[in-house]
A protein has these predicted regions:
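Nucleotide-sugar donor phosphate/pyrophosphate-binding loop at the beta->alpha transition
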Residues: 98-100, 109-128, 138, 164, ...
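Alpha-helix capping/helix-boundary segments
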Residues: 83-84, 142-144
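Active-site proximal beta-strand in glycosyltransferases
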Residues: 3, 75, 90-110, 130, ...
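N-terminal subdomain of nucleotide-sugar transferases
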Residues: 1-44, 71
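Carbohydrate-associated surface elements
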Residues: 41, 142, 160-161
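Short N-terminal targeting/anchoring amphipathic segment
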Residues: 64-85, 95-100
C-alpha cells in the first residue's frame, strides 16, 4: 500500500510526535508499505511564533496538492493540524478523497496558555479540522474520552506502545 503521511512535526524536531511518526514509518515500511512523508523540510518555512524550534510551511497548498496528485496514494494520513495538515485536508475534500487524522497534542491548551485564545475556540477549530476525517487517531483512552466530551466524533484508539529494544538499551 502507498501511504501519504502529512505532518508539520518532523526532523530535525525532537518531540513525542516526531518519535511516534518515525516509528510508525519504520513499522509500516518493515511490513512492505511505501510511506511518503510530506514534511516542512520540503517547503519554504517560517518559525512558529512562540514555539522555538518549530518551523511551519508557508502557503503549502498548491505544492501539497501537486505532491498528492503525483503520488496517487492508497491512503492519506494527516498527522498534525498545522499548515500541511490543513492543506492536505483542503485537497482531500476538493478531490473527494478519504483521509485519517490524529490528535497528538492538546494544542488548544497551548494556544490558551500562550495567546489567551479561549479553549472553546481552540477546540471548535480542531473539531472542524477533524470532522471530515474517516477516523481520528488518539493515543489513549483518556484522550478519547476527553475529545468525545468536547464533541469530537469518529475517534479511534491508536496506542503507541514502547520500543522494548530502546528501553532495554537504556
Amino acid at each position: 500500500m502507498k501511504i501519504a503521511l502529512l505532518t508539520d512535526a518532523w526532523l530535525p524536531q525532537v518531540n513525542g510526535v516526531v518519535t511516534t511518526l518515525l516509528e510508525l514509518v519504520r513499522e509500516l515500511e518493515g511490513v512492505g508499505h511505501e510511506v511518503q512523508v510530506v514534511h516542512p523540510g520540503l517547503f519554504t518555512t517560517r518559525p512558529c511564533p512562540g514555539y522555538a524550534g518549530i518551523d511551519l510551511a508557508v502557503r503549502p497548498g498548491r505544492l501539497v496538492a501537486k505532491m498528492l496528485d503525483d503520488m496517487q496514494p492508497d491512503a492519506i494520513h494527516l498527522a498534525t493540524e498545522g499548515p500541511l495538515g490543513w492543506a492536505g485536508r483542503r485537497h482531500c475534500l476538493r478531490r473527494g478523497l478519504a483521509f485519517t487524522t490524529a490528535f497528538h497534542t492538546k494544542f488548544p491548551e497551548i494556544l490558551h496558555a500562550a495567546l489567551r485564545v479561549p479553549l472553546s475556540w481552540g477546540y471548535a477549530l480542531f473539531r472542524h479540522f477533524h470532522r471530515p476525517s474517516s477516523g481520528v487517531m488518539v493515543p489513549t483512552q483518556g484522550v478519547l474520552q476527553m475529545l468525545a466530551q468536547r464533541g469530537f466524533g469518529n475517534l479511534r484508539l491508536w496506542t503507541h506502545g514502547v520500543d522494548t529494544q530502546a528501553a532495554i538499551a537504556n
